[in-house]
Curated annotation (Swiss-Prot):
EC annotation from Swiss-Prot or TrEMBL: 6.-.-.-
Official protein name in the record: Putative cysteine ligase BshC
Source organism (scientific name): Flavobacterium johnsoniae (strain ATCC 17061 / DSM 2064 / JCM 8514 / BCRC 14874 / CCUG 350202 / NBRC 14942 / NCIMB 11054 / UW101) (Cytophaga johnsonae)
Keywords of the record: Coiled coil, Ligase
Protein family: Belongs to the BshC family.
GO molecular function, one term: ligase activity
Root EC class: ligase
Amino acid sequence: MPTDCISYQTSGYFSKLIQDYLDQKSELKTLYNHFPTLENFEKQIAEKASNFDNHNRIALVNTLKKQYQNIEISDSTKQNIELLALENTFTITTGHQLNLFSGPLYFLYKIISTINLTKELKSKYPSYNFVPVYWMATEDHDFEEINYFNFKGKKFRWNKESNGPVGRLSTEGLAEFLDIYSLELGSSTNANTLKKLFEDTYLKHDNLADATRFLANSLFANYGLVIIDADDADLKRAFIPYAKEELEKQTSYKAVQETIEQLKEYTVQVNPREINLFYIEDNLRERIIFEEDKYFVNNTKISFSKDQILSELENHPEKFSPNVIMRPLYQEIILPNLCYIGGGGEIAYWLELKSFFDAVNITFPMILVRNSVLLATEKQAKKADQLNLSWKDLFTKQENLVNAITHKISAFPIDLTPQKEILKTQFQYLYELAAQTDKSFSGAVKAQEVKQTKGLENLEKRLLKAQKRNLSDQLQRVIDLQCELFPNNSLQERQSNFSEFYLEKGEQLVPLLLQKLKPLEMNFNIITI
């Protein structure tokens, strides 16, 4: 194949907002702090160092040690946790939901982007330490988003009821799920490794948070990854003043609404609530609403006066859960973080938040679009070569691709533009004639031109359809290849689970990705495995 990457901007899978951000358009410059280049991290380090409350490092390290108590920990991860106590240590963070068996492939790419960036930063700034962090979205309550994964075109769903924060959800019932999934995996060495990984992850851990920590640790512990569950009372102590301001002043709502006004030319990713906090218990996560001088927990009978809710916050900060607007702030309060790495949708909502961070005097992190990858087998790459297709061709929407290939391989031109030009010339003569006679004739000429031009356009469409039928065998091979690489006409990384590729590559998969991906290059990578 002629190239192994294409730009995000030309891939066709990124919004105008993200494309303009990547192009560093001037109208977006007020919405972020520093654009993520290796050189710009020097400024970000200085700003975070002067703004971060280093007392929060103690709670952070103690909490992480507690959370890692019952898990085998690598020397590199153990060292990174200890390093977080030092004032010259900073984090690079990504976050992800607790998707069953990691969910879509981009789970890997997020974490690999994070690990690789810490390596690049250590090389550039050796007097500092950089720790890769995976923030587990344990407080999310939308179980339907995470209770399945796709494997070889089939959806494997865990049917279970859940209302509260998913991190606290029991893993009971996943033994039966594994029985069904195992049948699809087969009995190869790599298949047996995957079965054991699933079993050790979900059948030996009581809740989804512990299970997901084990899974991510199994895949990435050797690279120093630190996994955090922020659904924790000690960590939330540092968040109390900001949650208090949110309850009393609705600062985030006002600031984000102003930013959304700036973004009106784009699709807005997230709209803020007046209060961007939830109230949580084991089986409950509902919005806090302020009405008539009282605070209500939505869909419950729970209510508080102002004094009562502030007392509840002081005594039980773990019962207050930030939503998508407040969670980034919580993250930046408890972590000495320099950069958040996320997908296009995440970066879009981070771009709404800088004015809010400024209002509460917290340094806004750099925001980096994660690595995106298309994994292709050698057989698929060879097939693309035989069909004379570039990777850019394969990223084209299917209808457009089929039309373009039909034009390309047709034995004769399908484009009737020359005939349209001849027609236009003929009618030009008639218009000149019409100018010398009655106006009604000029109208008749115009009507006839429209009719005949439309007729040629219809013939052109019918000719294209006829050639598609005539070339159906060749076109079907193109369609089949694209469908293999883009399941459900979507990006592979949003559809397929890592286990599909682990079956082929086994333990080589993660090291291969770590070796190939460069976090700051911001290209869509095509990797042949």
